[in-house]
Amino acid sequence: MSGKDAMLKVRQWIEQERLVVKEQKDPRAEMHLLIRYPQGPQGHMFAVVIPKGRDLVAVSSMTRVDEGQQKEMSTHMKEDKEAWLEWIHDVRLQLIRTSVDWGIHMGHEGDQKVGPLQAFNVSLPLWFDGLTKNEFMHTLRKLWLAKLGIIHEIKFTHGPGIGKPGPVDDWVKAKREGKQPPSSSNEDSDQSTHHEIEFDEKMSFGSGFDPSEWA
């Protein structure tokens, strides 16, 4: 399958499933789409990218943790450090068990990244030789369920939040260093009844193929 064939098929599948889609300008990609999955106001935003020079489709999604939940985590860290370390360890294990690529962004304390959990992303590649509608749709579903697992764990342990996205220190640092951090919009988080997440609206695909750059 060629890159043009892959782009055509992905667009057809998105249209067939009536998913909301936004075109993104990305000089490093043959195609860069943002789609909402599943349908409806509770859907999450996913980046669907075909990087230049690669024979794959990268699917990814970024989740930003609510400011109120971050404050609860900070309190948890101070009151019971061992319990906090166990909790974040369990989050990592849960992500590993989902069999998706993932990355987490922890709050900075000096040179250390001790917490709270500020954002996380999930991603999967789909190579052209295995690209079918079934694989594409199940990839979206798998990433969505991986996100939901962590979102519900955060909500159960640290409350529903205050409806305001919290800071992401890694993005602030990247901006200071002249790098382009992911940007986000309140448009999608405002449509969530629980308000614990905010969606990345940039999602540029990096040349290094670090999964954290897929979202």
Segments (PLM) and residue ranges:
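Charge-rich, low-complexity N-terminal segments
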Residues: M1-A58
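Generic structural motif
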Residues: P38-G40, G53, R64-D66, P125-D129
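Short, conserved beta-strand/beta-arch hydrophobic-aromatic motifs that form part
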Residues: F46-H76
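Glycine-rich, often proline-containing surface loops adjacent to acidic residues and nearby aromatics
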Residues: D55-S60, V114-D129
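Short, internal acidic amphipathic alpha-helical interface segments
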Residues: R64-A119
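Ampiphathic alpha-helical segments that act as solvent-exposed interaction surfaces
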Residues: K78-R97, F128-G161
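Short, highly charged C-terminal tails/helix-capping segments
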Residues: K155-P211
